[in-house]
């Protein structure tokens, strides 16, 4: 049973409800969940907030393509990709990637693949607030390097 939930939203997400949905089918043997949060320190500065913007049509298409690629590589059952936008504060959850499969290896690898591609290919723009003011966050070379293992 291949199903996916892809959401971009301002509201917080319910990890427990998502886990329940991911692991519901009796054929599921493994469920992985990654949750990314707003950290208090970035690039050597204290961060008090993060504002995320996106272009809805582009974002949904990019996320769907990432999920499709994961499904082509591994035998997966359910996938959840939920990304928040708008104003977030230190400690807030930004993103959840959840994958269920019959086997743990597929679930682990697909989750990492989706997150690596989401970080570099999904059109989200981040603006951090620090004591020195606001700044736009550019993609990191280390994030791009993570993609090499999937090529």
From Swiss-Prot:
Gene: moaE
Keywords linked to the UniProt accession: Molybdenum cofactor biosynthesis, Transferase
Functional pathway: Cofactor biosynthesis; molybdopterin biosynthesis
Positions bound to substrate: 37-39, 103-104, 119, 126-128
PANTHER family: MOLYBDOPTERIN SYNTHASE RELATED (PTHR23404)
Function text: Converts molybdopterin precursor Z into molybdopterin. This requires the incorporation of two sulfur atoms into precursor Z to generate a dithiolene group. The sulfur is provided by MoaD.
Enzyme class name: transferase
EC number: 2.8.1.12
SUPFAM superfamilies noted in UniProt: Molybdopterin synthase subunit MoaE
Pfam families: MoaE
Family classification: Belongs to the MoaE family.
Record note on quaternary structure: Heterotetramer of 2 MoaD subunits and 2 MoaE subunits. Also stable as homodimer. The enzyme changes between these two forms during catalysis.
Species assigned in the record: Haemophilus ducreyi (strain 35000HP / ATCC 700724)
Name listed for the protein in its UniProt record: Molybdopterin synthase catalytic subunit
Catalytic activity: 2 [molybdopterin-synthase sulfur-carrier protein]-C-terminal-Gly-aminoethanethioate + cyclic pyranopterin phosphate + H2O = molybdopterin + 2 [molybdopterin-synthase sulfur-carrier protein]-C-terminal Gly-Gly + 2 H(+)
